Amino acid sequence: MSFLGFGGGQPQLSSQQKIQAAEAELDLVTDMFNKLVNNCYKKCINTSYSEGELNKNESSCLDRCVAKYFETNVQVGENMQKMGQSFNAAGKF
């Protein structure tokens, strides 16, 4: 790779950049988890509950909600990657 950053592959990240990237990824994962918990809780858990444990309906609802959330997240991620690749191939940034 040249000193101007052209040619030969991707530039190497410094340790600080790797730490920042890991922190950003952790923030994204934490945010996604919190949204998943909030959305599925609102959808599946009755606000006037009287039991300490989840009942069968709540448990099934939460299971389906989490599965749909992850499936949707994967589909959106794949579509975003395809869009990014097509923009890069067309020379748009």
Curated annotation (Swiss-Prot):
The subcellular localization recorded is: Mitochondrion inner membrane; Mitochondrion intermembrane space
What happens upon changing C65S?
A: Induces impairment in folding and loss of zinc-binding
Tell me, what is an example of a GO biological process annotation in this record? protein insertion into mitochondrial inner membrane
Which GO molecular function entries does the Swiss-Prot or TrEMBL record give? metal ion binding; protein transporter activity; unfolded protein binding
Keyword set, alphabetical order: Chaperone, Disulfide bond, Membrane, Metal-binding, Mitochondrion, Mitochondrion inner membrane, Protein transport, Translocation, Transport, Zinc
> What's its membrane topology?
Peripheral membrane protein
Q: Where is this motif: Twin CX3C motif?
A: 40-65
Q: Does the keyword Acetylation apply?
A: no
Cited Gene3D superfamilies:
Mitochondrial import inner membrane translocase subunit tim13 like domains (1.10.287.810)
Name the segments for region: Interaction with transmembrane regions of transmembrane proteins in transit: 1-31
Bridged cysteine pairs (disulfide): C40-C65, C44-C61
| Record annotation: effect of changing C40S | Induces impairment in folding and loss of zinc-binding
According to the lineage, what is the superkingdom? Eukaryota
Cellular component, GO annotation: mitochondrial inner membrane; mitochondrial intermembrane space; mitochondrial intermembrane space protein transporter complex; mitochondrion; TIM22 mitochondrial import inner membrane insertion complex
Q: Which SUPFAM superfamilies match?
A: Tim10-like
Q: Where is this region: Required for heterohexamerization?
A: 73-93
Q: What does this protein do?
A: Mitochondrial intermembrane chaperone that participates in the import and insertion of multi-pass transmembrane proteins into the mitochondrial inner membrane. Also required for the transfer of beta-barrel precursors from the TOM complex to the sorting and assembly machinery (SAM complex) of the outer membrane. Acts as a chaperone-like protein that protects the hydrophobic precursors from aggregation and guide them through the mitochondrial intermembrane space. Compared to TIM9, it may function as a substrate sensor.
Oligomer and partners: Heterohexamer; composed of 3 copies of TIM9 and 3 copies of TIM10, named soluble 70 kDa complex. Associates directly with the TIM12 component of the TIM22 complex, whose core is composed of TIM18, TIM22 and TIM54. Interacts with the transmembrane regions of multi-pass transmembrane proteins in transit.
Which PANTHER family does the annotation name? MITOCHONDRIAL IMPORT INNER MEMBRANE TRANSLOCASE SUBUNIT TIM10 (PTHR11038:SF16)
Query: What's the record's remark on domains?
Result: The twin CX3C motif contains 4 conserved Cys residues that form 2 disulfide bonds in the mitochondrial intermembrane space. However, during the transit of TIM10 from cytoplasm into mitochondrion, the Cys residues probably coordinate zinc, thereby preventing folding and allowing its transfer across mitochondrial outer membrane.
Describe the family membership recorded for this protein in Swiss-Prot or TrEMBL: Belongs to the small Tim family.
Question: What is this protein's name?
Answer: Mitochondrial import inner membrane translocase subunit TIM10
Its organism's taxonomic lineage begins at: Eukaryota, Fungi, Dikarya, Ascomycota, Saccharomycotina
